[in-house]
Amino acid sequence: MIASKFGIGQQVRHKLLGYLGVVIDIDPEYSMEQPKADEIAANTDLRFAPWYHVVMEDEEGQPVHTYLAEAQLDGEAQEAHPEQPSLDELAESIRHQLQAPRLRN
């Protein structure tokens, strides 16, 4: 079993670019059809480590879905981000839904 470093709803930062993001899903290993060289950075070990679906914001504040290796991410220690409140709200909403899922008929 592969253990992931980050959880769904957790805020993370891209190590190189510094962008804030929220984890929305986790794959135990790279799961796209055919990996591009820049996505796995010529390191085959990355392919067999956890990969994360992360929502980040572009320069205009629009949500962007990214697919990143665990090695590309750091945990985010800061709770509030006044410059990106929508990502704080998304993280809180996801965590709330995981704690109290809605029952469906």
Curated annotation (Swiss-Prot):
Gene Ontology biological process terms, A to Z: response to heat
Region of interest: Disordered: 75-105
Main location (coarse class): cytoplasm
Record's keyword terms, sorted: Cytoplasm, Stress response
GO cellular component term, pick one: cytoplasm
Database matches in InterPro entries: Hemimethylated_DNA-bd_dom (IPR011722), Hemimethylated_DNA-bd_sf (IPR036623), HspQ (IPR022866)
Subcellular location: Cytoplasm
SMART domains associated with the record: YccV-like
Keyword Cytoplasm (UniProt): yes
Pfam families per record: YccV-like
GO molecular function: DNA binding
KW Cytoplasm (keyword) present: yes
Domain of life: Bacteria
Main function: Involved in the degradation of certain denaturated proteins, including DnaA, during heat shock stress.
Family: Belongs to the HspQ family.
Protein's name according to its UniProt entry: Heat shock protein HspQ
Species of provenance: Serratia proteamaculans (strain 568)
